Amino acid sequence: MFETLINNISKSIVGNKEKIKLALAAIISEGSILIEDNPGSGKTTLAKTITLNLGLNFKRVQFTSDLLPSDILGFNILQNDKLTFQKGPIFTNIVLADELNRGSPKSQSAFLEAMEEKNAVSYTHLTLPTKALV
């Protein structure tokens, strides 16, 4: 089954079986991975293809200097005299953080904390979905 999955993903990602195996190992172990590579090398395609093959959800966060922690984690909205939490993109199975080094220290810290602790803090602790790969 594992080899079939690798072969299916390899149809979209040519020549990167080692990256595919490492990414799948991270998903199985509910860990995280850091892929540093040149632009256009297929990092986003790899994440999307794995997501499709496993039937998971995918979100992408583009880190910029003006990105706020609430843009990643979510925020409270006042609706009908009641605070409702609007979940951010971190609340998905696979999150691709693009240009993480360009984010502000607060945004990086919020993202890395959620990644490590598998929860986000917004007045209460909210648990991230299982099989969350960041």
Language-model features, listed with the residues they occupy:
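AAA+/P-loop NTPase substrate/partner-engagement loops
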Residues: 57-78
